[in-house]
Amino acid sequence: APCTYPGQQCKSDDECCHGTCKTAFIGRICMR
């Protein structure tokens, strides 16, 4: 499955291409 890039919404760390899934103002996004 394709991975989620930084700045895009995610549900868990393992979805992210880089870094981790963190809570932001717009919901949870992948961050380096």
From Swiss-Prot:
Disulfide bonds: 3-17, 10-21, 16-30
Coiled-coil ranges per UniProt: none
InterPro entries: Toxin_29
Ranges that cross the membrane: none
GO cellular component: extracellular region
Keywords: Disulfide bond, Knottin, Secreted
Localisation per UniProt entry: Secreted
Tissue specificity field: Expressed by the venom gland.
Free-text comment about domains: The presence of a 'disulfide through disulfide knot' structurally defines this protein as a knottin.
Family the entry assigns: Belongs to the neurotoxin 17 (21C2) family.
Function text: Not toxic to mice by intracerebroventricular injection.
Protein name according to UniProt: U21-ctenitoxin-Co1a
Native organism: Ctenus ornatus (Brazilian spider)
